[in-house]
UniProtKB/Swiss-Prot annotation:
The gene is rub. Keywords: Electron transport, Iron, Metal-binding, Transport. Residues 2-52 form the Rubredoxin-like domain. It comes from the Archaea. Rubredoxin is a small nonheme, iron protein lacking acid-labile sulfide. Its single Fe, chelated to 4 Cys, functions as an electron acceptor and may also stabilize the conformation of the molecule. GO terms for biological process: alkane catabolic process. This is Rubredoxin. GO terms for molecular function: electron transfer activity; iron ion binding. NCBIfam families: RubredRD. Fe cation binds at C6, C9, C39, C42. Belongs to the rubredoxin family. Disulfide bonds: none annotated.
Length: 54
């Protein structure tokens, strides 16, 4: 599964881990995150994330 990095603060969203503190189950793909999901560290919207290449 992919990892996505916040271009503002560097937080990494790992699809394997999800974001359980904010109701996102492990295994949730970035594209499947709700449109109102934001970076749990700095509050940046999904549009401020970019996919990390392997």
């Amino acid at each position: 599964m992919a990892k996505w990095v916040c271009k503002i603060c560097g937080y990494i969203y790992d699809e394997d881990a999800g974001d359980p503190d904010n109701g996102i189950s492990p295994g949730t793909k970035f594209e499947e995150l709700p449109d109102d999901w934001v970076c749990p560290i700095c509050g940046a919207p999904k549009s401020e994330f970019e996919k990390l290449e392997d």
